[in-house]
Amino acid sequence: MTCQAFASSDNFVPLNSDSSPSLPLIMHHSAAECLPVSNHATSVVSTVPSVLSLIQTPKCSHLHFAMMTSGNVSAGLHYSVPSCHYGNQTSTYGVMTGIKPATPEMLSASLSQSRILQTCSMPHPNVVNGVSTLQSKSFSFSCSLTPCLYKFPEHALSASSCALGHSFTPMHQTLLSDDPTAADFKQEFRRKSKSVEEPVDMDSPEIRELEKFANEFKLRRIKLGYTQTNVGEALAAVHGSEFSQTTICRFENSQLSFKNACKLKSILSKWLEEAEQVGALYNEKVGVNERKRKRRTTISIAAKEALERHFGEQSKPSSQEIMRMAEGLNLEKEVVRVWFCNRRQREKRVKTSLHQNAFSSIIKEHHECR
C-alpha cells in the first residue's frame, strides 16, 4: 500500500490500525496547519498552537487512499465528507475528488455505513492541552471527523478508530427532575399505603373484641339451629357471592385479616339480630300450638271397664251423666266425653263390617243355589 503525493509541500501522517498495515492520510495543509492523528483517532491535537491554527481559515483539505497490489494501482476511493465547525469558521475534510468521481453505489454505501458507525461511536473527552482556556473564551469546540467508510482488505474498523469525540451541552437538571406535584402525590400515596399495611397489635382492644364477638356469634348461631352454610347462603343472597361457608368458618376461627374481620363483624351482628327476632316469633307460634294441643291421656283398666258398662247401658249419655261419671272415675269431663265419642265410632265400624260380612255370605249362598 502506498501513498500518492500531490505536491512536494504536502505533509502526511500515517493512520495506523492494530490489525492492518498503515494507511496514509494525506492532508493539504501548511506546516502550521498540520493535524496529527493517533492510531485510533482519539486525539485531535496535541498543542494549543496547533488548535489555534485551526481557528484560522484553513485551506481546502483532501484525503486520498490508494492501494498497490501486485505492482498495479487499484482504483482510488473518493468521496466528500461533511464539514467540521470550529466556532464561526468552517473547515472541510474529505477524500480528494479531483481524480475520480464517486459512483452512486459508493455514496449510498458510505451513507449507510456512516449511520451505523455514528450510532456505535463513543464520546471522547477533550484531550487538547489548554482546551479550558479556549472554552473560557467562549469558543465552542465540536468536531466529528468522518470515519473510513469502506472496509479495506485486512483493515478492520472499530468504533474507537472511526470516531472522534463529541462535545454536547448537558441537559438542564430541572428538565430531568420529576414534576413536584407528581412527587407529592407519590409521597402521599406511599404514606397512606404504609399506614394501611402497618401490622395490628394482637393484644389491642380491637382484636380482643373481635375474638369475643366471634365466640359469641358461634354459640348463638348453634343455639338458633343455623349452620355455617345457612349463614353464608343468607348473606350471599343479600350482599353477593363473596360470603360462603368458608368465610364464616374463618371468621369464627379468627383466621381473617383485621380489615376483613371488622367489615364482616357489622354484617354478622346485623344478621344475628334479625335471626334472633325470627327465632323468637317462631317460638311464640310453636308455644301457641302446644297450648292448643293436649298430650295424650292414659286411662286405667278399671276406668275402661266402668266406661264400657255405662256404654252398654247408654251409648249417648247426656252432659250431666258424663260429669257424674268423670267425678266418680276421677277423670276430666272432656276425657270421658271423647272416650264415648271414640267408642261409638268403633261400634259403628264393627256393625258395618258385620253387615258387610252377612250380606256377602247371603250373596254367596244365593250363587251356590243356582
From Swiss-Prot:
Ranges of the DNA-binding region feature: 292-351
Compartment(s) where it occurs, according to its Swiss-Prot or TrEMBL record: Nucleus
Short motif 9aaTAD, span: 5-13
GO cellular component: nucleus
Sequence ranges assigned to domain POU-specific in this UniProt record: 202-276
PANTHER family referenced in this protein's UniProt entry, alphabetically: NETRIN-1-RELATED, POU DOMAIN
Name of protein: Pituitary-specific positive transcription factor 1
